[in-house]
Structure formats: structure tokens, C-alpha cells
A protein has these predicted regions:
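Glycine/threonine-rich helix-loop capping motifs at alpha-helix boundaries
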Residues: 1, 102-115, 262-281
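N-terminal Rossmann-like NAD(P)+-binding subdomain of aldehyde/semialdehyde dehydrogenases
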Residues: 1-160
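Conserved small-residue-rich beta-alpha loop and adjacent elements
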Residues: 136, 140-218, 223, 251, ...
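A structured beta-alpha segment of the ubiquitous adenosine-cofactor-binding alpha/beta core
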Residues: 161, 231-248
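Hydrophobic/aromatic ligand-binding patch that stacks against planar heteroaromatic rings
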Residues: 188-189, 244, 268
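General beta-strand structural signal in soluble alpha/beta enzymes
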Residues: 198, 231-234, 254-257, 276-280
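A glycine-rich helix N-cap at a beta->alpha junction
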Residues: 224-231
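Conserved small/polar residues in nucleotide/adenosyl-binding loops
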Residues: 287-292
Length: 292
């Protein structure tokens, strides 16, 4: 029998919120005053921290993930050659001086705003070295052998057989720190037939938006891939990252940045049933396999 549940429309200072089975978190006066009808409340089960997701941030992320879900379905009907063409055109648009000019201008604005706020701009400046690195990264994915939907192992017996197929995951969510060159990282999952939604740190949001407008979307269109294949969450709010990682439609959540923030994002994803890959303190993974 289905149960009726009321919507949470307000909070009261001192209100006790159960979590972790036998613990409670207490609503602060600030959280109670800020919470509005339509907002979402996430209780981090690892720590009891109460996270408010404003209604507009939830709606923004919900729409982006919905488009990525549709994009993932449509991507299955596209060819590997189309995906190859996407990476090629994306790299080409970044190489073209006329196309890159508004991206460079947006980056200058981002850098000036960051400096005015006393923020580090070490990884924010989209200089020629970073530009070449982005192009090389995209061309690397372009030249990677297509590896979607193929049989990787099979066993045959009299009257029956079983086979293991490699298949795409689905929608992959990324939360990155504020640096413009994350596009090659995020878009890499498209090579294997996945769609992606990502949020970037506020310092680089203007640059990221310009890259989407002048290079990413034109590359998707030129290759005939669905526009929902790659979606940028155009929000500077940290709550957008929490909304993204609490969306159960994600197949995988990937976070990069400072250790504490990444750990919290991972906790939000895990308690929502989403697999996570976290990179908060640096490190390296090496995968090896037998020679073919």
C-alpha cells in the first residue's frame, strides 16, 4: 500500500532531523530562515551536515540531467565515426583563432574577477599551453579505438552459451574545480557511448560557458550527436553540485577538488545509490593488462 508523504516546506530553528539510524542533526537559525517551499534538504549520513538545495538549483540540475538521459539514449543510435568527428571538430574549433577569440575574452574576464576576489589564478589562465593541451586531449580521444558494445569474452557449451558484452554506463556526472581544461576530461566518456553532466568551479564558469557556446555545441551539431550528450550546469552555487550528485539517474559521479568538499560530495552520491570516483588529494592509478 502506497504511503502519502507531505512536502517539506519549512524548517524551524532547533528542529531535530534524524539521520544514521540513531542520531539527530539540529536545524540552525540560519538554515531555518533561508529554507523556502520547493527547496530540498539533504542530510549527509556520514556527518549529519544539513545541506539546503534551493529550488532553482534543483530545477536547473534536474533539467540538465534529464537532457543527458535523453542524449544517452539517442547516442546509442549514433555511429563511432560520428563520435570521432565530434572530438575532431571540437579540437578544430578550439584551434581556430576566430572561434577561440570570444573564449579567450571570457577567460580574461574570469581571471580579472578571480584576482579581484583574491583567488589564485594559477590554473585558471587559459594560455597557449593550456589551449594546446585541451586540443591534444580531444585529439587523443578522437584517435582512441572505438570500444562500444562489443563481446569481450564468451563461453560455449552444448546447447547454450554465455557472453560478456562491454556496454556504456549511462549518464556520468562530474564536479570539477575552477579550471577551463576539464572539457577533455569530461568529454572522454563520450568515446565509450556515455553522456555527461558537469559542474565547474565558479572562477571558470564564464570560460566554460563560452567554450560550450562557441566550440562544444557546434561540434556536437557538426557531428550529428544529440545536444544532450554533454551538458554544463551553468551555476556558480555549490548546492548545484549537491543536487547533481544526489540525482539517482547518474550511473557514476566523479569529483575533483579539495579533499573535504570532494569527500562530502562522495557521501551525498553514495547515500543516493550512485557509484563514485573521488580525486581530492592527488594520486595515481595504473592499470595493466596482458599484451593482446
Amino acid at each position: 500500500m502506497a504511503e502519502d508523504h507531505d512536502r517539506l516546506t519549512s524548517l524551524e530553528a532547533g528542529q531535530r532531523i534524524p539521520f544514521g539510524g540513531d542520531r539527530v542533526a539540529v536545524v540552525s537559525a540560519q538554515l531555518a530562515s533561508e529554507f523556502r517551499p520547493g527547496d530540498h534538504l539533504v542530510v549527509v549520513q556520514d556527518s549529519g551536515r544539513l545541506l539546503r538545495i534551493p529550488a532553482e538549483q534543483h530545477e536547473l540540475v534536474d533539467a540538465a540531467v534529464g537532457q543527458a538521459v535523453s542524449g544517452f539514449g539517442a547516442l546509442a543510435e549514433c555511429t563511432d565515426d560520428q563520435i570521432t568527428a565530434f572530438f575532431d571538430r571540437f579540437a578544430g574549433f578550439l584551434r581556430d583563432e576566430d572561434t577561440f577569440a570570444p573564449i579567450a575574452a571570457a577567460n580574461i574576464d574570469d581571471v580579472e574577477r578571480a584576482r579581484a576576489r583574491g583567488r589564485s589564478t594559477t590554473r585558471l589562465v587559459l594560455d597557449e599551453k593550456m589551449r594546446r593541451g585541451m586540443i591534444a586531449g580531444l585529439e587523443g580521444w578522437r584517435d582512441t579505438t572505438a570500444d562500444r558494445d562489443r563481446v569481450v569474452d564468451a563461453i560455449a557449451h552444448d546447447g547454450w552459451s554465455v557472453a560478456a558484452h562491454r556496454a556504456p554506463l549511462g549518464v556520468v556526472g562530474f564536479v570539477f574545480e575552477g579550471r577551463p581544461n576539464v572539457f577533455a576530461d569530461a568529454c572522454g566518456v563520450v568515446r565509450t557511448g556515455n553522456s555527461v553532466v558537469f559542474r565547474i568551479g565558479s572562477d571558470a564558469l564564464g570560460t566554460a560557458t563560452a567554450i560550450v557556446e562557441h566550440a562544444l555545441l557546434p561540434a556536437l551539431a557538426a557531428a550529428g550527436l544529440p545536444s544532450g550528450t554533454v551538458k554544463l550546469v551553468e551555476s556558480a552555487e555549490h548546492s548545484a553540485g549537491h543536487a547533481l550528485f544526489s540525482d539517482r539517474r547518474l550511473a557514476l559521479a566523479v569529483a575533483r577538488g579539495s579533499g573535504a568538499a570532494v569527500a562530502e560530495l562522495g557521501a551525498v552520491a553514495r547515500q543516493s545509490g550512485v557509484a563514485v570516483s573521488l580525486h581530492g588529494t592527488g594520486g595515481c592509478l595504473l592499470y595493466t593488462s596482458p599484451s593482446p
